[in-house]
């Protein structure tokens, strides 16, 4: 009898406690997404009737929304004889867009003497991409960074009275000549011609980053690969820059000039891109400002990455503040540090598990384009005279 009484009391106490509990409700409603169309001066068609368009949220190919999965492969850093098999493997791995840098300093080691043969045969590489239906984004510089000497500005140019990455007419004349050479190599291979080239990146991290002299030459200033008026904004690597850029108009003018010169030399693609992170210069409504996420940056000391947390990345891009209205452009994270350069004092190893987590976090945060930088490894070649 006592056992029954104790059991009844215990049940009554449990029921009273249960009903007395405060019930909380968690709600995380998604903000209704407004998709803008028609404001971006980009898009194009090919001879077979295909078309590419872009709105404020995503890219469409032949009228269907797509998520570009970009895999970076620098052809000049890998043997020509193996290019084709590597392109095929990348496609089998799920890559549907291949971006590649055109490193000025490798193609014009001596002033006026351009090399487009052997492992530097740009045209052959793009033709192989066409053969295997691999869309391409050409990153034409002139400054590339790309973890290469001078950001790929040729050594000989520093012996001339030029202000690199500036609006100086002399510097721009050298860039114009470079673009002319690139344009001739790519003739007939653009999307409008039935070729694989769907995009073109202009410059790299304009008014944000310079080639990492501070890494390669410890103690040296950061003023060798940046315009004289932008020295105060030169950083070694990708980072947050929240100070006001007082020379912003000069940077934006420079980007517009580069686009105009590229088009004059025949480099005409459905869309153009510019690295938009860290308050860098962009071309409003005329180029997609792509973003990045480096979880193992060699230019910083090891620390917890901020890129483990989900957020509305379309509204607040990584490495904000930025110099554009993020919600009027699609979020394409073009440089996700799935691979990274090693230096003597910092040798990060990016595991496949870490790269996968970064991709899931970025897509889950609302990005509609991801880019593995790097997807394919390689080694920077020595100078021909070495």
Predicted regions and their residues:
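N-terminal carbohydrate-binding accessory modules
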Residues: 21-97, 127
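Active-site-adjacent "subsite" loops/lids of carbohydrate-active enzymes
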Residues: 144-186
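Active-site neighborhood of glycoside hydrolase catalytic domains
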Residues: 174-273, 277
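Conserved, mostly hydrophobic/aromatic
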Residues: 63, 90, 98, 129, ...
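Bacterial Sec-dependent N-terminal signal peptides
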Residues: 1-22
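Catalytic-core region of carbohydrate-active enzymes that cleave or remodel glycosidic bonds
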Residues: 252, 257-273, 302-385
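Short, well-ordered coil/turn segments that N-cap beta-strands
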Residues: 67, 94-96, 130-136, 191-198, ...
């Amino acid at each position: 009898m006592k056992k029954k009484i104790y059991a009844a009391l215990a049940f009554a106490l449990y029921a009273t406690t249960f009903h007395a509990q405060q019930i909380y409700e968690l709600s995380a409603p998604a903000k209704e997404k407004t998709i803008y169309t028609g404001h971006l001066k980009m898009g194009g068609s090919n001879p077979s009737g295909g078309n590419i368009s872009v709105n404020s949220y995503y890219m469409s190919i032949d009228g269907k929304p797509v998520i570009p999965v970009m895999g970076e492969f620098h052809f000049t850093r890998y043997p020509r004889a193996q290019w084709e098999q590597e392109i095929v493997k990348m496609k089998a791995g799920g890559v549907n867009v291949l971006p590649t840098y055109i490193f000025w300093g490798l193609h014009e080691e001596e002033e006026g003497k351009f090399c487009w043969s052997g492992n530097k045969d740009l045209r052959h590489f793009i033709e192989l991409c066409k053969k295997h239906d691999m869309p391409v984004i050409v990153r034409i510089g002139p400054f590339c960074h790309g973890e290469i000497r001078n950001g790929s500005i040729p050594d000989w140019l520093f012996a001339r009275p030029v202000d690199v990455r500036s609006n100086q007419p002399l510097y721009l004349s050298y860039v114009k000549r470079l673009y002319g050479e690139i344009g001739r190599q790519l003739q007939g291979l653009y999307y409008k011609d039935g070729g694989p080239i769907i995009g073109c990146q202009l410059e790299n991290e304009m008014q944000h980053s310079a080639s990492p002299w501070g890494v390669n030459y410890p103690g040296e200033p950061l003023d060798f690969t940046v315009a004289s008026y932008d020295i105060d904004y030169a950083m070694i690597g990708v980072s947050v820059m929240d100070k006001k850029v007082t020379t912003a108009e000069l940077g934006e003018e420079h980007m517009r000039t580069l686009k105009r010169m590229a088009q004059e030399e025949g480099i005409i693609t459905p869309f153009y891109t510019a690295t938009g992170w860290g308050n860098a210069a962009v071309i409003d409504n005329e180029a997609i400002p792509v973003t990045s996420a480096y979880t193992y940056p060699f230019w910083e000391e090891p620390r917890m990455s901020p890129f483990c947390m989900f957020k509305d990345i379309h509204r607040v891009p990584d490495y904000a503040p930025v110099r554009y209205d993020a919600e009027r452009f699609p979020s394409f994270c073009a440089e996700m540090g799935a691979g990274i350069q090693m230096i003597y004092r910092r040798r990060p190893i990016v595991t496949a598990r870490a790269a996968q987590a970064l991709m899931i976090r970025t897509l889950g945060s609302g990005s509609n384009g991801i880019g593995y930088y790097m997807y394919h490894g390689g080694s920077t070649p020595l100078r021909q005279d070495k």
